[in-house]
Amino acid sequence: MDGSSLWMLFLLFFIVFPQMKQQLIQWRRVTAIRNCEKRRGTRIITLIHRQETMGFLGMFSRNFINIEDSEEVLRAIRLTSDDTPIDLIIHTPGGLLLAAEQIARALKRHPSKVTVVVPHYAMSGGTLIALAADEILMDRHAVLGPVDPQIGKYPAASILKAVESKAVNDVDDETLILADVSGKALRQTRDLVYELISERLGEEKGMELAKILTEGRWTHDYPITVDEAADLGLPVVPNDQDS
């Protein structure tokens, strides 16, 4: 066998092997999910975004909530009978608000109990989805996060604060436009959060929590712990032992 053939075999191995390994991992995950569904009597749906290494080159991809995710999750919800509870296992840094909003509203409308399971973190749009649940089952060290909207690379609340600290004549047109968009984004997100939680918390408490989570009180990556989430009024259950 000549050198070029050996090189082709070497290249083929390092292309095919990672794919086979990933398929094996996926098969094990599906098996574990099906066993868990039988034990809990629920339909388990997963929304998992991890930084995955790809092949022997060590390249990686970072995943976020997108429209493809919402299509898949909504399809799974539609295929779940009304009398079957849903467990949504979520692990995500967040992502596209539209996609997260679609998932949250679909979960909210499901007639049976909805539990969102957070093994590690569900930030931003992930937290928005969790707000639609009847119960949020979190690992003791898992975290949620604020859902304040981001405009480009800046928090909407910070854009408004910067503009309000200056005279209008001292602010360029582009920044004024960003401030207008920021105001709309803040109102829309606050109203969405209120829609998701007001039935459970009541109007006054629901609006208070909606403001807290959207007003830019914290940085966007601020970790809301299990205890803090419970203090805010979220239906959090710490997973201190196997259930």
Regions found by a protein language model. Name each.
Residues 1-118, 131-243:
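Terminal-region recognition feature
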Residues 98, 124-125:
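Residues that form or flank phosphate/diphosphate-binding pockets in enzymes
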Residues 109, 123-124:
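Long, distal/terminal scaffolding or interaction modules
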Residues 128:
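Short glycine-biased active-site loop of nucleotidyltransferases that positions the nucleotide triphosphate
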